[in-house]
């Protein structure tokens, strides 16, 4: 089992609470705060509820970094990595890690979407990709945004729409 610090544990629990309540969530965690590890319990919780989860990130290198970690964390789950040029097995996967561009393939497919590195370049500026996130999720599905540097716009949206919020200073 993974050992989390108290702050990581709290953020993980807060994220589970938000996802269970089908509420969007902003996880604001500085670099090196172990944000990937914080996601494992919430992802496991969703998978145990027979939910389909997508972790989407703007950058292929992040997909390639997360994929083996997710395979290791969820050895009994078929995890799929989707990015430009990937070999794709045509079988259902309950847990997908994908570039945000790959979300365009999906419609109402995911019960939970986690956007990792939500501050990274293409997602911030690309309204089409933001629409893709909304299209790829089921109507009730919550979206969790994970970032070290949330934009003012994201923070304002979080506040206005009463999302869950977790902050990890280190």
Protein language model features and the residues they cover:
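Residues immediately C-terminal
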Residues: 59-62, 88, 103, 119-121, ...
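Conserved motor-coupling elements within RecA-like helicase/translocase cores
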Residues: 65, 69-74, 78-98, 102-110
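Conserved catalytic network of the ASCE P-loop NTPase/AAA+ motor domain
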Residues: 45-48, 88-90, 105-108, 135-140
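N-terminal pre-P-loop "Q-motif" helix
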Residues: 2-23
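Conserved RecA-like ASCE P-loop NTPase motor core of nucleic-acid helicases/translocases
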Residues: 51-59
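Post-DEXD/H (motif II) to motif III coupling segment of the RecA-like Helicase ATP-binding lobe
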Residues: 108-170
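Walker A/P-loop
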Residues: 20-44
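Structural beta-sheet core signal
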Residues: 55-56, 81, 143-145
């Amino acid at each position: 089992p993974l050992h989390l610090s108290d702050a990581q544990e709290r953020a993980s629990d807060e994220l589970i609470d938000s996802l269970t309540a089908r509420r969007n969530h902003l996880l604001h965690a500085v670099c090196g705060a172990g944000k990937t590890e914080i996601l494992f319990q919430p992802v496991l919780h969703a998978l145990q509820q027979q939910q389909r989860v997508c972790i989407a990130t703007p950058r292929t290198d992040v997909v390639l970094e997360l994929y083996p970690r997710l395979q290791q964390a969820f050895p009994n789950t078929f995890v799929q990595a989707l990015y430009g040029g990937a070999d794709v097995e045509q079988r259902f996967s309950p847990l997908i890690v994908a570039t945000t561009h790959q979300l365009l393939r999906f419609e109402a497919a995911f019960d939970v979407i986690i956007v990792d590195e939500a501050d990274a370049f293409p997602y911030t500026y690309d309204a089409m990709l933001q629409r893709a996130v909304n299209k790829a999720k089921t109507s009730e599905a919550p979206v969790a945004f994970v970032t070290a540097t949330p934009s003012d716009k994201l923070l304002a949206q979080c506040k206005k729409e009463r999302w869950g919020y977790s902050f990890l200073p280190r």
